[in-house]
Amino acid sequence: MFTQAAAIDFQIINALFTRVISACDILGIDGDFAKELEETLAELPPIKISERYGTIQEWIKDYEETEPGHRHISQLFGLFPGDQINETDSAIYEAAKKTIARRIENGGGSTGWSRAWTVCFYARLKDGYNAGEHLGYLLKNCTANNLFDIHPPFQIDGNFGGVAGITEMLLQSHLGTPQNRIVELLPALPEKWSSCSVKGIKARGNFTFDFSWRNGKVTKLSVTSAEDNTLLLKLNEKTTDIQTDKEYTVEENILKMSFVAGETAEMNF
């Protein structure tokens, strides 16, 4: 099918333009060019919800789907790896849930890389159960004995995507502003992973995290910043009763803690 204005095209353009605008602001350069990009962004078609299916439209027009279980789910680029689709817009977020559910119900995710992408989608949707189930399917049915992802031929997309999905299940840092990303721990934790630990996981802002959890709640956390920066950590039922020697403030359930390059903070919960 050929059409103007495929959803993925404008989601990629949105991701590119917003990052270039942010870079111009941080570096203090090319202000006129950044303004031109902002004006162009305002003219792009918005993400649309299909009146037929309640899903994210793949095209500018609300076409009838000819292959609802297709392995490609391009209209959700803005959910992952992009960040345009997120919980700040509940209607679009719910439509994204319906989009992936409809694909899977009709046989989607049949290849290794597509199944890995599905893991990433469910992680961003904060659905630990489905993220874990599709990760299990990826490892059991789409992975060779040597751990190569299979399409059936080897495709490294599935290996990289699977690791990305696991990372997103344990830590996310895509929300907030480009210079002030909000870190959330255990956003999509399966019940089977109720007590465990992870080391060396990176977050936007050049932070490195080591943390442990028990019964789905963080118990110990070590954060190292590679540069002068401020950590914004989302607090919820998984991160309560903070104990640390380092100063911090909390506003609207966001912990704010300043770091100098190379500094490490230890926290217990």
List where the protein language model places each region.
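Active-site core of glycosidic bond-cleaving carbohydrate-active enzymes
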Residues: A6-L175, I182, C196, T219
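Non-catalytic C-terminal accessory modules of carbohydrate-active enzymes
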Residues: Y129-D245, T249-F269
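Aromatic (Trp/Tyr) and acidic
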Residues: T3
